[in-house]
Amino acid sequence: MKTESKNLVRWGILSTANIATKVARAINLAENAELVAIASRTEERATAWAQKHNVPIAYGNYDVLLSDSSLDAIYIPLPPSMHAEWTISAAERGKHVLCEKPLAADSDEATMMADACRQNGVQLMDGVMWVHHERTAMMKQKLGDLGELRRVTAAFTFSWNTIPTDNIRAKPELAGGSLGDLGYYCVRAILWAFEEMPTKVFATARYKVGVDFNLAGILWFDDDRIATMDCGFDTSLRKWFEVAGTKASLVCDDFTVPTSEESARFWIHGSENEKHETGACIQEVNMIERFSAIVQSKNLEPEWADVAVNTMRVCDALLESDQRGEIVNL
């Protein structure tokens, strides 16, 4: 049940991109949020989207939406190349920002975004939904049962039979590519498990239409720990990770998006194989409720921006390694 309307965090969405529909549903289901406005590049498109999704206000201009003083928080699902411009613009107008992943086109832009939000006293978070699922907290608790953590392996792929020319993932000028779209999740899973940055990385990628079509990477950490990851648009759907320790390993085969909203699973493989399950959970609703709670409390959580910037730093290093053909130190 929604809280009193006067206490709800008022959201605006900057773009009618496909993912905006999913997040709009999450805002509508969240107990502490309401979707007030949508903006698109044309008033006609914004109005049509608003009517379809029962949004009260439609703007045919992104800048006008950001000038709406009634809005508390902005969700930005624009192409990655546009994230920095509009996040900084939102922050300068006192809006809290939930920005779709990857956080930016590169780590320099990501740092600028984080700095702008901090200087203007607003929250910044990237749109990585899986970290907000109840299963993720349960898995985190179980990592201690694995012994000393030694390895993390993560993969996220899907297959394009024909490259869609109108998809932002395939447009280098919009900062497309498999690493930002898919590998970003893998890097986040590795940082989530090891809770620190790698010391060096190596990667190799294959390019099509000017973007990394697939990429495989190795990440080295202190104490002889290693992580590997791969992502790409050329393999059937895979969205799994494994965390291996000296006593047991944890495996999740659908970590980015659980197969069902009714339950989510993972396994512990050791002397006995254990299957663990959670109850019903919609991770994007949890994300919106968490973000809105931060806005309501006025107690900002800078660690969300920090981990997003660090994810971008690792992604940049992986791309640099591929381009140089050698190990890159962080």
Regions inferred by a protein language model and the residue ranges of each:
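Active-site loop of classical SDR/Rossmann-like NAD(P)-dependent oxidoreductases
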Residues: H276-E289
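Predominantly a Rossmann-like dinucleotide-binding segment in NAD(P)-dependent oxidoreductases
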Residues: W130-F202, Y207, G325
